[in-house]
Amino acid sequence: MTRREWLAMMSTAPFVRRVAADRAERVAQIVAAFENQGIHRTGSDVDRASAEWLAAGVRDAGLTPSLEPFPLSRVDPIDAAFTVRGRRISGVPLFDAAFTGAAGIEGRFGLLGAEAELALAESPPNAAAAGALGDARRTSRYKAIVCITRGGRPGLCPSNADAFLKPFGPPVLQVSSEEGGFLEESARQGAAVHLVARVERKPIQAVNVTARLAGADGSLPPLVVMTPRSGWWTCASERGGGIACWLELMRELKTGPLARDVVFVASSGHELGHLGINAFVDRRPGIVSRSAGWMHFGANIGAAQDPGNTVQASDDLFEKMLADAMTAAGLAVTRRVPRGTVPGGEAEVVHRGGGRYVSVIGRNALFHNLADRGPESIDPRVISSFGDVFVRVARSIASRNL
């Protein structure tokens, strides 16, 4: 797809739906529309409008959508910045750490491990609770921490707030890797600094989008298909491929008989400790272990920048189903997660609940990056091929005795 074609789609209203005959073209349209909606943080106005848009896509695929609410104490950053040597650097607070008041925190700056009041650390996306940074947060040695985010490309790449409901440690302000050299020099100098991570909280209702496709025997354990739909930025390649495959699977499964029901959920709350999928499970006691299986369309499916594919599965049979289907579609399995390992993403709730699951998570140089947007971020043909893979796996699980 050319940039001109992409921009032509992006110039349309964010929630207009256009149905193309070719799946790759439909995929590109879906991802462009999703990106064009704005920043997809859980519980935001964009998140709610995107849920309505996705529900319309479910109806277009021939199913009846539901919007299932769950409670959220939404964090709205009001002032998040770090001032040092006359420069003010904006950032994003870590959402599962403490915050500051309006006055912020002042003190001497130093490298992590040094004698200082505010420390400088660094972390790749989603590793803020691990390593030296995680240790520093747990010991509360410092009044506050500045974290240089190290993604696959330069920029601000926040970590998810896995402990959103049980925050810990001092305030942490995440900043772009492009500020790294200046901040490291300032820390070595022991500069006087000021950090503010002021937020407001607002009680709201976020929503999951769900649907159910009836099979021949509703008494059989269902297949559950899940994909997250929220994130820190516009998330074109992070979330777009999974959402497109989720909709395409509905469209394909609607055309043929199935032995059992298929339940679909696109969950919000991904970046906040998977709040949405946990709410979905809580509304359905026992669904994790009583289901025939779960399919998880994780992050970065069909991402074009430094791509790769990680397979996660509960058992050998499910892994073989997915790996064989990927091989048949010409898609490489870059990495297989060892059996028994706690999987990444929403598949974690199934693993911990003793359910059966199969999952794909992609690699992506733009993961959690503000620059995750535009036609160069995705490969629609690869996403379309994953659509073939997921149809094959879903039909296998939904049609056999398990």
Placement of each model-derived feature along the sequence:
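His/Asp/Glu-rich mid-to-C-terminal helical/loop segments that flank catalytic regions of hydrolases
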Residues: R251, L366-L402
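Metal-dependent peptidase/peptidase-like ectodomains
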Residues: G218, P257-L258, S267-A365
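N-terminal capping segment at the start of a domain
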Residues: V19-D45, A61, F70, A81, ...
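Second-shell loop/turn segments in exported
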Residues: V19-A20, Q37-D45, P124, F168-P170, ...
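Soluble metallo-hydrolase cores and metallopeptidase-like ectodomains found primarily
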Residues: R87, G91, D96-F109, P158-S237, ...
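Catalytic-core environment of secreted peptidases
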Residues: R23-V46, L54-G62, T83, A121-N126, ...
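Noncatalytic luminal/extracellular "stalk/propeptide" segments of secretory-pathway proteins
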Residues: A32-G131
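N-terminal export signals
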Residues: R3-A21
